[in-house]
């Protein structure tokens, strides 16, 4: 999994990416959010489910807001909050390519792409590691 850091610059209340043009305007913004990490390689899954953990530790993170937004004509925002085991699930997501964002106050947000496909390996899941800090 290749991870790159994208730093947000706040100009007159507008969010602008310093490195790329990943669309985040429709996603929820944490009150303390200043750093967003991007996972470059897309997750390929049969359904949108997975786990969020603390970076470099197996400690699950509860209370992480995971949002996905379709590309093209399917711009509907779908969301889930990770449970005490760090697990989340968004039901009824049709096949396609989606942007995602994981956010929790006090942590650096994570963005990336996921591909929902019936051809994905069984048991495939989204695995997100979040860094402490804003």
Which residues does each PLM region occupy?
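A short, solvent-exposed loop/turn motif at the edges and junctions
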Residues: 75, 101-114
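Short, surface-exposed beta-strand/beta-hairpin micro-motifs centered on an aromatic residue
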Residues: 83-92
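Short amphipathic beta-strand segments in non-cytosolic proteins
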Residues: 64-79
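Short strand-edge motifs at loop-to-beta-strand transitions and within beta-strands
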Residues: 88, 124-126
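Beta-strand-rich domain onsets/edges
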Residues: 19-47, 53, 129-133
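Short beta-strand edge segments in extracellular beta-sheet folds
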Residues: 114-121, 129-133
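Structural motif
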Residues: 50-62
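A glycine-anchored, Pro-Gly-centered beta-turn/N-cap motif
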Residues: 94-97
